[in-house]
């Protein structure tokens, strides 16, 4: 086992504090509408420019092991906030730095660290409750746009685009952010159920210009296995021909004789038909076929259920107003499924999302949920250069997360004002002087975000904080973008409660642990061995080679 280096009390805390400060100082320059960018060197490709706190934090690794421990603990704050709320990482870092700095001073002055931590926890739980009470629910699309705009650093076009996407796909719908191939940023909404499988043969195309197969008011046959023998399909094909409606076949695969016969019938004009492979693989394929069945009001034809293809009647087929199939995708619009059954399926998938521990499964379940609940919107972020696109994509991601959080738990005044107000309204009293000091540490820390936003905008932080606190209006604050004071909510400067709450809870949890640290252990740096004379002469006379050793 390698030798360890151990540091105690003041020495340990000072080294740790240095690490915390290095990381927090790099992150906090990005806070607020006038926050600056950070350039990160990449081992390959162009440097990355970002204003996203967690991206900056994740890049920082310090040489000194003890300083690095402090930095990594604060990095954990940013990552945790990012995982839960998706935004507010810089605020969380600023709060954590302030609590650690003030806590360090208090411990150095001889206070009991455990009591300080109790005081910190008391104050934080009171502030979280107060934020919940002050929250204002979001009702209009304009309010959604405001949240998005603030989080995208005052970029109104991003806010509007996110509001439009949410309006179209609903709060359950999935909104994804991709890099565009052009310089324009655009929004594309896919309504209905879309999956990434195209037609099995180009002969199924109905619109040769666009190379798509459009089926209006179609029947949909969902089959779990491969279809290679046409004989079993004849009864159902004949029944569909009688109705003169088109048919879409979704199965694991259609091959050989079956595919050839379908194509020939299509070309002769007797049968309006198209076939696609089922989406997904393994168990997920079964689940997705079930989803399509519920959406279209049909049944999955499966040997497991004892349903044979020969016995399938029209009543087992799904129905949809329109099906559009391109080379890569199939979209089913307006399925004939019952509302109650779709709702039941949505609730079931939500339950699975709650229970799963794998991020990958969660993402896939969320996609399925969106396809059932309303559709998928894609925001394609464009820019003149790759570096610009990446920077903008970071902001759009943040804005999207903030908007979701706002819809979930409501909004409070932005610009650090909600926390600043909370600092003046903490009523909790500690059981002793040290706990009271812990409560005061949180009081001071709650002012840090508003002060940092002001100083990043070139204003004097103390004057701004003083002016805001003098005015008793709950939403009165400082607009760093214009340099004016006024009602933050009226000016559209709002923060999601979830983001502010998560930032404070995560910051206090990690900072509280750092304050109570008394010893630190890290691997000792390896000492380089002096002069290399030993191996050379060993073979000579006995120990003759030792001459090179430098005692």
From Swiss-Prot:
Question: What reaction gets catalysed by this protein?
Answer: ATP + H2O + a folded polypeptide = ADP + phosphate + an unfolded polypeptide
Under the heading SUPFAM superfamilies, the entry gives: GroEL apical domain-like (SSF52029), GroEL equatorial domain-like (SSF48592), GroEL-intermediate domain like (SSF54849)
Q: What is its main location?
A: cytoplasm
Quaternary state and partners of this protein? Answer: Forms a cylinder of 14 subunits composed of two heptameric rings stacked back-to-back. Interacts with the co-chaperonin GroES.
Q: Which family does it belong to?
A: Belongs to the chaperonin (HSP60) family.
Q: Which residues bind ATP?
A: 30-33, 51, 87-91, 415, 495
Q: Which gene encodes it?
A: groEL4
- What Gene3D superfamilies does its record include? GroEL (3.50.7.10), GroEL-like equatorial domain (1.10.560.10), TCP-1-like chaperonin intermediate domain (3.30.260.10)
Q: Which InterPro entries match?
A: Chaperonin_Cpn60_CS, Cpn60/GroEL, Cpn60/GroEL/TCP-1, GroEL-like_apical_dom_sf, GROEL-like_equatorial_sf, TCP-1-like_intermed_sf
Report the protein name in the record.
Chaperonin GroEL 4
Q: What is its EC number?
A: 5.6.1.7
Q: What class of enzyme is it?
A: isomerase
Q: Which species does the entry assign this protein to?
A: Mesorhizobium japonicum (strain LMG 29417 / CECT 9101 / MAFF 303099) (Mesorhizobium loti (strain MAFF 303099))
Question: What job does the chain carry out?
Answer: Together with its co-chaperonin GroES, plays an essential role in assisting protein folding. The GroEL-GroES system forms a nano-cage that allows encapsulation of the non-native substrate proteins and provides a physical environment optimized to promote and accelerate protein folding.
